[in-house]
């Protein structure tokens, strides 16, 4: 499972930290744990989305209407794109692409925020199936949380890989948390 793989990777990275000079290990230890926490937060968000959707399906669900599907599709695509950008940066150590990925995270966060506010307004009007609307709102909120966790992961990975003197750090630290 993904959780088992994450634990295995974490163990290997901890063993690697033991082989590094103490000063470097201490400096990077915090960033290492923050990146692990970000990954755990993402898994938890995905589980929360899955649980809500699964429960909705198990209870003779009313499907999401075409308007909501059309609204969410570009957000989903944007989230997938950001995930792929972050994956590439971390996988290949391409930290020069970090500012662009950070901007993409901020744009995605704003887009999810706009969508969340619109959905909350629709819920308040009482139109539509309230259960479906709440499941949709949950999807939006958890997707937005995924973007926030990705931003935190980027920051932690940058610090872990390049140290605190990185020129990219000022970009990441200046963002709203």
Give the role of each language-model region.
Residues 1-177:
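Cytosolic, long alpha-helical scaffolding segments
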